[in-house]
């Protein structure tokens, strides 16, 4: 849209050197001009491809960010579940310590236990109480971490359903090589790296297209008004008005022949960025393969450790029961009872932490592959 106005006045001599005539002229012009690129030899297409792939890369990274959030929430949930299990185990350990202390006190009263045995039993009970409070503190910290991972204030009163008896994930029926192939195809951040490579390639084409000419279609239409007056009057007419319309259409070609190698340097920079994008993509693929590899074998190790922890818990429970029975008939000493109780407490903690490790490594493996549909 064009809008142009002009007002001018001039002083002109007439009929001698002392006679001055004032000439006033006012003009106004309004119109529309259209410019349409007819040929640009790939400029617009290259720019379209560049921005389209940039948008795709952003969308893929957004999807990966969502997966990161889900992964953090899962990990913190499993940690909270483990902390709750340790609190429950510590409470059982405290109850057992109190039971041992009560039994020792009864035996001390009738002369079947010594004062050192009684003091050791009390010491064991106090240690169990201390460990229970430490477990509760850790539980509060894990709850706070989970709420923060969910985007909530730590003090929000939310009751989480923690099921320590929930079944563990099934064993995988595919190997680590197949999981790596799945990650190469499913991870959004790798798709974003590929989109960035395509974006850099389109940027090279856009830079190369600047070497070519450009042809535009130009069209315009305008309406013009004019008003003038003369003072003093020396010849008629001394004033007047007029208007008319104008239009134009044509082709406009442009071609930069020399720019001090500015365009050439832009092409070199675009090609260098393309090579860098390809290297970043290759590095991302290697890192993804490494993450899947590590997560897979950590998951395998966690499952084996959990199996040993189950056996350890069963053996420690049986050992404590046998030791207590022998202690009641005088075949075991108090230090042996406390050692068996300590071994059971350690076995419970190993069972709880190894179970949480199985869940955590399962979540790590799913996150490393980028596919939430892994079902074995």
Language-model-detected regions and their locations in the chain:
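Periplasmic alpha-helical coiled-coil/stalk elements that build and connect Gram-negative outer-membrane
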Residues: 65-182, 295-298, 302, 322-325, ...
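Acidic, low-complexity, intrinsically disordered peripheral segments
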Residues: 9, 154, 350-376
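A glycine-/polar-enriched beta->alpha junction
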Residues: 1, 32-50, 59-67, 71, ...
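Heptad-repeat amphipathic alpha-helical coiled-coil interaction surface used
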Residues: 48-50, 55, 62, 80, ...
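Small/polar, glycine/serine/threonine/aspartate-rich low-complexity segments that form flexible
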Residues: 1-36, 161-173, 205, 218-255, ...
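Amphipathic alpha-helical coiled-coil scaffold segments and their short linker/junction regions
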Residues: 113, 117, 152-230, 236-238, ...
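A glycine-biased, small/acidic residue-tolerant capping/turn segment at secondary-structure junctions
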Residues: 314-338, 366-376
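Short, contiguous acidic/charged loop-to-helix segments that flank catalytic cores in large enzymes
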Residues: 235-244, 257-260, 266-267, 289-292, ...
């Amino acid at each position: 849209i064009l809008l142009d106005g002009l007002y001018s006045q001039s002083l002109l001599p007439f009929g001698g050197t002392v006679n001055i005539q004032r000439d006033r002229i006012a003009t106004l012009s309004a119109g529309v001009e259209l410019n349409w690129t007819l040929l640009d030899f790939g400029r617009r297409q290259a720019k379209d491809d560049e921005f389209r792939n940039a948008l795709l890369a952003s969308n893929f990274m957004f999807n990966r960010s969502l997966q990161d959030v889900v992964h953090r929430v899962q990990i913190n949930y499993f940690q909270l579940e483990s902390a709750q299990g340790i609190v429950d185990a510590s409470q059982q350990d405290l109850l057992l310590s109190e039971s041992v202390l009560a039994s020792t006190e009864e035996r001390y009263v009738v002369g079947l236990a010594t004062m050192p045995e009684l003091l050791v039993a009390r010491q064991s009970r106090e240690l169990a109480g201390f460990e229970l409070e430490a477990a509760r503190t850790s539980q509060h910290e894990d709850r706070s971490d989970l709420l923060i991972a969910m985007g909530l204030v730590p003090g929000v009163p939310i009751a989480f359903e923690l099921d320590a008896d929930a079944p563990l994930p099934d064993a995988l029926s595919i190997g680590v090589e197949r999981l790596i192939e799945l990650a190469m195809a499913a991870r959004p951040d790798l798709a974003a790296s590929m989109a960035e490579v395509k974006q850099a390639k389109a940027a090279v084409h856009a830079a190369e297209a600047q070497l070519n000419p450009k042809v535009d279609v130009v069209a315009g239409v305008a309406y013009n008004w004019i008003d003038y007056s003369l003072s003093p009057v020396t010849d008629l007419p001394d004033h007047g008005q007029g208007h008319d319309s104008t239009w134009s259409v044509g082709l406009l070609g442009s071609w930069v022949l020399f720019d001090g190698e500015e365009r050439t340097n832009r092409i070199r920079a675009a090609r260098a960025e393309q090579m860098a994008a390809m290297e970043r993509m290759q590095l991302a693929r290697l890192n993804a393969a490494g993450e899947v590899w590590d997560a897979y074998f950590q998951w395998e190790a966690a499952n084996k450790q959990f199996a040993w922890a189950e056996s350890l818990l069963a053996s420690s429970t049986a050992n404590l029961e046998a030791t207590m029975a022998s202690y009641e008939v005088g075949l075991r000493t108090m230090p042996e009872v406390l050692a068996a109780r300590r071994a059971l407490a350690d076995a419970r903690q190993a069972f709880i932490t190894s179970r949480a490790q199985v869940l955590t490594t399962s979540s790590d493996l799913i996150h490393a592959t980028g596919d939430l549909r892994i079902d074995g």
